[in-house]
Amino acid sequence: MNPYQRASPRTASPASNLQTNPTRTNNPRHSADRNSYFDNPPYNDRGSEDGEDDMASRGDHMAETDQRQYQKINQVIQNFFTKSALSIVSSRVILPTSFNKNGDIRQNKWFNVILDDSDELQLRLTEWKTMDAMAGQHPPLYIEVYLDISGLGHKQSLVVHDEDGKRWDVAAALNAAQPTSRASSRPARPTQIVIERWKIYVGDIDSVHPSDLTEPLPNVYKKAVVLFRGLYANLRLLPAFKYNKSMAKQPANHTSLKLNYRILNGASERPQLDTLSLPLCPSTDPITETAHIGSTNSPIGPLCISVEYRDACEFSVEDSESLLSDQFMGLDDTYLEQKPRAAAPVPGSLPVDKLNTQETPDVGQAYGSLSTFHQVGPPTGTSPISALRAARDMPSSSPIETPPQKLPPNHRTAQGSKSSLRSNDTSSFQRRTSVSFQPFKAGSLSSSPAPGPAGPASPSSSLGRPTSAFGRNINIVPNSLNQPRNRTSLNALPQAALRAPSLPNDNAIASSASSSPKPAPITRYSSSFGHRRGKFSTGGSKTEEDALSSGKGSATSSLQRGSDTLNDGEGGSSGEMRSEDDNISDFLKLLEAKKDLKSFNRSDSSTRDATMRKTTAQLGKYQRMRDSHAQLSDSVSSSTMLHRSSSSSSRQLSSVPAMIHGTSISTASSPGKPISPHTPHTPAIPSRLSANSIIEYDQPHRSRNHRSRSRSGRTARGQGPENLEEQSEVEDDAAGIDIPLSPRPWNYQRRSSSVAQQNRNLPEDEPDMFGVRAASLPVEEGDRARDLHRITSTDLTSSGLFAQTESLASASRDNQAPDDGDSRDDLPRASSTSNTPAKRGTYSSNLRGRGGFFSQGSSTTGSTGGTSSTERQSRYNFNSRAANLDDDEPLLFQMSEIGAGGSRRSLEEARGGSSTGSARGRNSPWGGR
C-alpha cells in the first residue's frame, strides 16, 4: 500500500491550495492589505485533518486567532502610551488615587513598573486607550508641564534666578513676548510658562529593518520593560523634578507655585504662544534642551519617547516691592556703566592734551554717607548720587590757558603707603590725609615740610581739622598757587612755627576790580576731611565738637544758592570758631576769573589777631601736655624698677616688709643726678660698695621705740650757730642715699607717717650706738668709752680700723673750737651714726613718709668723711629745723657730693668704723653731746 495515494485527492482539492482559494485570508491578492506580522504567526495553529467537513471550522478558528493577536498588539501599544503618560505626570504632579472594588488602591503594573493609577489621568487619555494602532490610528501624545502665574496675588511675582543669583520677573518676559498684531481684538495676557514637553509617538516604520518588525510579541513587551525603567530614572534627573521636590518641602503657609500638566494631541490646536523656548533672563546658554529617552520596536513601528525641557528652573515667588527694588539697583548699576571710562592715569605720566582733567572723576573715590562725601573731583553735591549726576555738567573750558599739569594720583592704582604718596607734583585738589598729633611725645623734625620762600604756614586755617582743597579745573590755578604741599602732621611742624606763628596771609582770591590775585600761603596742612570745620580745644563746647566729629557740621550739607560754593555762616569772636569759608579757601583760589565774593575776603586785623591767639593757645597747650606726659611715662617706668629693687633688698631685711618706704637699701648711685622718690635705688655701675653690701647682723636686738625716745631727749652740745650750715653739709655727704625734696626756706607742717609710728623690733644685727643710755651718764665719758670699744673690737677689719681712726682724729680737731652748744641745749637731738632708723624721733616721720633711706648716715659711709666733707657738713642742719617742729624734718641729701672726699665703703666697713662715726658725732647735730 502506498501511503501517498491517499493524500493525492486532498492535495488536488482546490480548497487546500493556498494560491487558488479566493476565500482564504492568506490569498496573495490580500497580502498587501495584511500586516507582515500575520504571515508568520507566533503561535502554530494546526488545523484539523479529519476531513473536508472540518475545513470550514478550521478556517474560522484561524480567523479568531489572528483577531486575538491583533488585539494583543493594540493593547501593548495603547498601554505604552498610557503608562508613559502616567509615569511622567505622577513624577511632576500629585494625582488623585483610584480604588478597585475591594477598596484598595488600583495600581498599574504594566511593563513591570508599579504605579498608582488615577482615574483623572485615564479620562484625559481616553483617545489613546481606544485607538486602533494596527489600523494606523496612533496620534502622538504630548504632555506639557507648566507653571501658571494667574493664581498669584497682586503683590506677588514669579521670578527666575539666573546663574549669578539675580532675580528676573517672569511676567515681564511673558508680556514682552505677547504678540501685538491684532489691534482690535486684544488677546489675553499669557500666564503660563512651559517647563517640559514630552512626546510619545510611533516612529517611522521605514527606519526599522523589516526583520525587527516580525519579532514575537513577548519580545516586544520585554524590550519595552527596559525602556520604561530608563524613563523612570530620567524623569528624576531633570530640573522639573528638582523644582517639584523643593516645593514639596516648603511649609504650608509658604506661597509657591505647583506644577501643572496638560495632555495634547499632536493634531490638536496649540496655544498661540509657545513659552517653552521663551527667554526669561539674558543668557548666552541655550534655553531648552532635547533628550531622546529611547525606543522599542513593535509590529507597527518603533515606539519612541522624547522630551524638550527648560534648563533653568530656579523659580520662586517673591514680593513685588522687593523685586522692584532690585530693578532700581540694576538701573543704578547700568547708570554707572553707561559712559565708558578710560584708564585712570598715574602721577608722572605724559602731559594731558585736554584742559579739564577732572571732568569725569573716578567713581571709586565717591564714598561715605550722605553727609560726609569725599571724592577726588570737585564738590558736586551733598550726596553721592547727586554728585555723580552733577559730574556730567562740569564745565570743560577755562578762561585762563596754562601749561598742562600732571594728573593727581589715582588712589585705586597707586596703592603705596602714605609716605610714598608725598609728592611735590601733586595737584591742588588731591585728596589728602588728616592732620594727626601725639600729645605724649614731641614730634621729630625729620618729617618737617619742605622750606618755602613764604616762611611758615599761615595759622588762619585750622590746624586741628585742616582744610581740603577742591577745584573745578587744575589749569585755572595760577602758577603762584601751584606750590608743593606735603601732608604734614602737627608734631612735625618746625619749632619756629610752633613758638611764634606768623600773621595769616590772605587767600588768593581774584578780585573783580583787579586781575592779579592776592598772595596765598605757600604751605598748607590739608586733609581728606577738610570739608569739616576746624576744631579747637580752647574752651569750646563739647556739643559742637561732637557734631563736627560725627559729620553733622559737614560743609557739604549747606550749598549757598547761586554761588556754587559752600558757606556756613560768619565767624565769631576770638574765643569762637572762624567762618568755614577759610576751610574751603583752596576751592576759592580756583574761582579767580569769577565774581569776587566779599564774604570770603576777611582780612581785617581783628580776625588775624583772634586766629593768632587761638593758634598760640592751641600749640602751647600741647607743648605743656608733652612735658606732663613725659614725666608720667618716666614715673611709670620708675615705679616698676622700684618694685624690683625693693624686692631684692627685702631679702636682707627679712623682718621688714619689702614695699615699705625706707627698707630698700641702696649702696651706690650715679653722682650728680638727682633721684626722685620714685627712682629705683639701683647702682648704675658696679662698685666696691655693691660687691660687699651684705650686712652682718651681730648686735643685740633692741626696740626702736626705746631708741627713739632716748634720741629725742638729747641736746646738741659743742656746736655754734655758725657751724649749723657746715654740719648739715657733712651729714649730706655722709648719707648713704639721696632722698631729694624740694628745698624750702622754712619748715612746713607735716603729719607723721603711720608707718613710722609702728613699733617693730628690728633684727639683732642693727647696733644701737646711742639709743639706750642713762640720762645722768656724762656724754663725754660715754662717748670715750664707746670710741675705745670700737677701736679695740676684735672683729674690726684693717680698713674699718683706719676709718675709725681717721674719724676720731677729725672729731678731736673739731672739739678744739669753742663750745657754743649752750645756746641750743633745748633742741632735740638725734643720732645719725646709728645703723637703725628713728621711729618716733624728731625726723622719723619725714624719713619714713618720703620713702627715704633710714638713718645710716655715718654708719654706712663712715669713712667717707675727710676734711672736705666736714667743711660741707652744715648745709642743712638738723637741729636748726627740728627746733621749730619735732615731727617735721624734710631731709635733702646731695648725691653729687657722695664720695667727694674719699672712696665709698661697704656696710661692713662702715659698721667696723662705728667708733670713728661716733667721734664725728660729737660735733654733729645727729650724735653730738
From Swiss-Prot:
The keyword Protein transport applies. Keywords: Autophagy, Cytoplasm, Protein transport, Transport. Residues 635-656, 855-871, 912-929 have a biased composition (Low complexity). Signal peptide: none annotated. Pfam families: ATG13. Residues 8-29, 368-385, 412-437, 476-487, 551-566, 749-761, 830-847 have a biased composition (Polar residues). InterPro entries: ATG13, Atg13_N, HORMA_dom_sf. Residues 702-714 have a biased composition (Basic residues). Residues 55-66, 600-612 have a biased composition (Basic and acidic residues). GO terms for biological process: mitophagy; piecemeal microautophagy of the nucleus; protein localization to phagophore assembly site; protein transport. Residues 1-66, 342-487, 503-581, 600-770, 808-929 are annotated as: Disordered. Activates the ATG1 kinase in a nutritional condition dependent manner through the TOR pathway, leading to autophagy. Also involved in cytoplasm to vacuole transport (Cvt) and more specifically in Cvt vesicle formation. Seems to play a role in the switching machinery regulating the conversion between the Cvt pathway and autophagy. Finally, ATG13 is also required for glycogen storage during stationary phase. Interacts with ATG1 to form the ATG1-ATG13 kinase complex. This is Autophagy-related protein 13. It comes from Phaeosphaeria nodorum (strain SN15 / ATCC MYA-4574 / FGSC 10173) (Glume blotch fungus). The gene is ATG13.
